From Swiss-Prot:
Record keywords, A-Z: Ribonucleoprotein, Ribosomal protein, RNA-binding, rRNA-binding
InterPro entries, per database record: Ribosomal_uS4, Ribosomal_uS4_arc, Ribosomal_uS4_CS, Ribosomal_uS4_euk/arc, Ribosomal_uS4_N, S4_RNA-bd, S4_RNA-bd_sf
Organism: Methanosarcina barkeri (strain Fusaro / DSM 804)
GO biological process, one term: ribosomal small subunit biogenesis
Domain S4 RNA-binding: 111-175
Alphabetical list of PROSITE patterns matching this protein: RIBOSOMAL_S4, S4
Similarity comment: family membership: Belongs to the universal ribosomal protein uS4 family.
Protein name: Small ribosomal subunit protein uS4
GO molecular function, one term: rRNA binding
Feature: compositional bias, Basic and acidic residues: 198-208
Length: 216
């Protein structure tokens, strides 16, 4: 138990710290979502792990009860978990408990305030979105929001905008983006997929090795 008033660690670190594939994936997520460090990736992964663990437990209970499925308290728990994930836009409204197992870390990162500010066209880049939030330029329902990592519900998403006293309220402000790219407005494409596509497009073609001329 943590001491009162002392912040306890809200995430789990990787069990094997030197896995090359996992480390490369974490670096991609940090760059794509403009994260401060890998800890923010681990927080999202821990949140996802919690929901997946609950889903596995409920599915195991349903399998043990054979044809009856989930009943009573377990059925209520299943409905509450699904309702919360649907409310935050992490899964679709017609999803069931099985769909939780197919979620990835980027599904959690997509619902961060920082990501939503970029997708709504309130910032030019994901890094600028983080800067606008931490500097107090962004508000939800008129209330200033300064935490880039807070998860945004679908309802609150419609009320994200510039804070009333922010200079960015003026449409002539030079740092205010004119329009949002269509690929960013499409919520079905994750920022990670956008970053990977951009990287593949900018990657120069591999040149074949220079052939050595044989002696005559």
């Amino acid at each position: 138990m943590a001491y009162p008033g002392k912040k306890s660690k809200s995430f789990e670190t990787p069990r094997h710290p030197w896995q090359e594939a996992r480390m490369a994936s974490e670096v991609q997520l940090v760059k794509a979502y403009g994260l401060r460090n890998k800890r923010e990736v681990w927080k999202a992964a821990s949140t996802l792990r919690m929901y997946r663990s609950e889903a596995r437990r409920l599915l195991a209970s349903a399998a043990n009860s054979q044809e009856r499925g989930l009943e009573g308290h377990q059925k209520t728990q299943s409905e509450e978990i699904l309702a919360k994930l649907i409310r935050y836009g992490i899964i679709k409204s017609d999803a069931d408990i099985d769909d939780i197992l197919s979620l990835k870390t980027e599904n959690i990162l997509e619902r961060r305030l920082q990501t939503q500010v970029l997708r709504l066209g309130l910032a030019r880049t994901v890094v600028q979105a983080r800067q606008f939030i931490t500097h107090g330029h962004i508000a939800i329902n008129g209330r200033k929001a300064t935490v880039p990592g807070m998860l945004v519900s679908k309802e609150d998403e419609m009320h994200i905008g510039y804070y009333a006293t922010s200079p960015l309220v003026s449409e002539s402000h030079p740092e205010r983006p004119v329009q949002v790219a269509s690929v960013l407005a499409d919520s079905t494409t994750t920022l990670r997929a956008v970053a990977e596509a951009k990287q593949a497009k900018e990657k120069p073609p591999e040149r074949g090795g220079r052939k050595r001329r044989g002696r005559r």
